[in-house]
A protein has these predicted regions:
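Early-domain small/polar-rich strand-loop-helix modules and first-structured segments
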Residues: 1-83, 149, 360-431
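Conserved phosphate-binding catalytic cores of ATP/NTP-utilizing and phosphoryl-transfer enzymes
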Residues: 1-8, 145-174, 270-293, 366-367
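A short acidic Gly-Thr/Ser loop motif
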Residues: 11-17, 167-184, 189-190, 243-246, ...
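Conserved phosphate-binding loops in N-terminal lobes of ATP-dependent enzymes
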Residues: 33-122, 127, 205-229, 236, ...
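Glycine-rich phosphate-binding loops at beta-strand->alpha-helix junctions
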Residues: 119-131, 228-256, 263
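Small-residue (GG/TT-enriched) beta-loop-alpha framework at ligand/catalytic clefts
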Residues: 121, 129, 136-222
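Structural alpha-beta junctions
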Residues: 138-151, 233-236, 253-268, 275
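Acidic, glycine/GT-rich loop-and beta-edge segments that sit at the periphery of enzyme/chaperone cores
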Residues: 270, 277-372
């Protein structure tokens, strides 16, 4: 690889192992780093061994030293860090940051120097705890919000799928992910629009009994029933089988049930490759022809009506489709002479926009021309937003009164084009 060119990193953090892929624009597809030269051994166990003399070992090298008395062995690093979200200790937070840093440094095997343009981390479920942990990792590694992004398995599956040839996604696309005793099913549905094709993912999850996991014939029978249930009433072009659970030659009846009119692929590294595609794709300003919608995406646009140079206009507070946990812009605005805020809500998939009128009360006691507010829309999730206004003072002439107004706004509200007025005074606790 040419070290002078931009490169992108995709990291798959599973429950007990990680994988990493590198991608450059002159490559046909991302390349997954193997832990053994000449072999497709991609999984890196999420374990560490901290030797007392200061040396740290990761993955398989740590497992070799697990029983040695000259250090400490740590396993389940990702799960341990997630559990620390509600505890006082942060030991596993530090270990997880160290592990991710080590993964990124594997780029040096390919002669790549400097920081990647973007790192994308994909995890099974992007829960509140996972979001907080990954934000902590980003801060500790000194990456910006654009330089380290994160997503769940459904989105990385989407990113991998729609970077393949079109014949593979003419209809729905399915993925079975089987790791340990956890079996998951993802089904991508695509809806063509005028400019962008909208994609959503249906999900199902099972905990496979240990007595079945260890018996090939029972597993084949169990999985055959899962396939029947999952494929019912769906036209599917392609099926991916991902994870260690599909090792061994036990897929017999299951493949018969799947049918012969679908393409099938068996592998381990689809999700890390999808993350690498995402690191590259989401770093580009140009619009892609596909949009993935899920519960952690903002479900609409939120615009604030303003007056500028005698004409009405709008400024964008919330962008539809952005992750709800991403930073939103803030603006400083002068008071326009009327205690009314007008918002326009445009929901994804809705034909018409809605207008919401909000009325301010208890304005600061000073001339209207000296009223200036800082305004920002702060998401709570993909559909709920808090519109926050604070008195910004007016330079050296008037200090801020400290007053704050907060307006709850629902992006999924139903109703007509104009909503009823709501009156809001300063937030409780404001002066």
């Amino acid at each position: 690889m040419d070290q002078k060119k931009e490169f992108y990193v995709g990291i798959d953090i599973g429950r007990d192992r990680a994988m990493i892929s590198l991608y450059r624009e002159d490559q046909k597809e991302p390349e997954t780093i193997s832990t053994v030269r000449g072999m497709e051994k991609f999984g890196i166990p999420l374990v560490m061994f901290l030797e007392k003399k200061g040396t740290t070992y990761y993955g398989d090298e740590a497992l070799k030293r697990k029983e040695q008395p000259n250090g400490d062995f740590f396993e389940d690093i990702y799960e341990g860090a997630l559990q620390e979200q509600t505890e006082e200790t942060t030991l596993y937070h530090g270990l997880f940051v160290q592990f991710v840093r080590r993964l990124i440094r594997l780029k040096e095997r390919y002669g790549l120097k400097g920081d990647p343009t973007c790192v994308a981390i994909t995890v099974p479920v992007l829960s509140q705890q996972a979001i907080a942990l990954l934000q902590y990792v980003r801060q500790e590694l000194d990456f910006s919000e654009k330089e380290l992004i994160f997503m769940d398995y459904a989105e990385s599956f989407f990113l991998h799928t729609y970077h393949q040839e079109a014949v593979l996604w003419q209809h729905d696309v399915a993925m079975f992910y089987f790791q340990g005793a956890e079996l998951s099913f993802y089904l991508l549905h695509r809806k063509s629009g005028l400019k962008v094709q909208f994609v959503t993912a249906e999900q199902k999850h099972w905990q496979v009994p240990e007595s079945i996991c260890t018996h090939a014939e029972l597993m084949d029978e169990y999985f055959s029933n899962v396939v029947r249930e999952s494929f019912a009433k769906h036209a599917i072009s392609t099926v991916y089988f991902v994870g260690d659970g599909f090792d061994g030659n036990w897929l017999r009846e299951s493949l018969r049930v799947m049918g012969t009119n679908k393409r099938g692929f068996l592998g381990k590294n689809l999700l890390t490759r999808g993350a690498a595609y995402g690191a590259w794709r989401y770093s580009k300003p140009e619009t892609w022809g596909f949009f993935f919608n899920c519960e952690y995406k903002m479900q609409g646009e939120l615009d604030l009506r303003i007056e500028s140079q005698g004409a009405d206009g709008f400024i964008r507070l919330i962008e539809a489709g952005q992750n709800w946990f991403c930073q939103t812009p803030s603006f400083k605005l002068l008071y326009g002479g009327t205690p009314e805020i007008v918002l326009k809500i445009s929901r994804i998939g809705a034909a018409n926009s809605q207008v919401l009128h909000l009325e301010l009360t208890d304005l600061p006691d000073r001339p209207e021309a000296a009223l200036r507010f800082r305004i920002q829309a702060i998401p709570k999730n993909g559909t709920e937003v808090t519109l926050r206004l604070s008195d910004d003072g007016f330079g050296g002439f008037f200090k801020s009164s400290g007053k704050i107004w907060e307006f709850p706004v629902a992006l999924d509200m139903e109703g007509g084009s104009t909503m009823e007025k709501a009156r809001y005074g300063p937030k409780k606790g404001g002066r």
